[in-house]
Amino acid sequence: LRETKTVPAPPCPITLLQAVPKGKIIESIIQKATELGVARVVPLLTERVVMDLDDKHAARKGEKWQQVAIEAIKQCGAAWLPRVEAPVTPKEFLARAEKFELPIIASLQPGAQHPRQYFEKFQAQYGRKPQSACLWIGPEGDFTAAEVAAIAAAGALPITLGKLVLRVET
C-alpha cells in the first residue's frame, strides 16, 4: 500500500528566465531551481550567450533539461515538476507578452532593491502576495544594455542581493 497526499500548488508560481551559461552549468541551475520549487524554467539565448542552436537542437536541449528536472524532483521529493522549455531569445520571450504580477531582473545597476522590498510593496499595495512572478538572470557579463532596456520596458523591476557580483549559478 502506498500513501497519497494532496499537495496544494505553490501560491506564487515563479518562472525562472535563465541565460544559458557555458558548459553544463545550466543543468545544475535547473536542478537547484527544481529543488527550490520554481514552476517553470525558460533558458535564454542572450547576445552574450556562447551557444548557437537551430530549432531542432533547441528542442532537444529543452527535452534533455526537462529530464534533469525530473531527476531532481525524484531526488528531493518535491511535489511539483517545473516545465523546462526549449531555449529562446529574450526578444522571443517578450513577444509572447506573458503577464506576471511581479517581474524582476537581477541587476548590477544602482537603484536595484532586495526582492523582499518588492514583495512587501506589492503586499502593501494590493493587500495580498503576488500570484505570479518571473525572475530574469543574465549570462556571464550580464545582459546587454539593449536587453535590459527591453526587459525593463516590459515591467521588470531591478533586484540585487547585495553589493557582491554573484556567479550566474548562485
Regions found by a protein language model. Give the residues of each.
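A C-terminal functional module that forms or caps the active site or interfaces directly
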Residues: 130-150
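Short amphipathic alpha-helical segments
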Residues: 30, 55, 117-119, 147-150
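Short, acidic/turn-prone active-site loops that include or flank metal/cofactor-
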Residues: 110, 140, 163-166
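Generic structural signal for helix capping and beta-alpha/helix-loop junctions
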Residues: 50-51, 113, 168
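RNA substrate-binding interface of SAM-dependent RNA methyltransferases
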Residues: 2-105
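Glycine/charged-rich beta-loop-alpha catalytic/anionic-binding loops adjacent to active sites
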Residues: 11-15, 131-133, 153-161
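Structured adenosyl-cofactor binding patch, chiefly the S-adenosyl-L-methionine
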Residues: 145-170
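A mid-sequence, solvent-exposed acidic-amphipathic segment
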Residues: 87-136
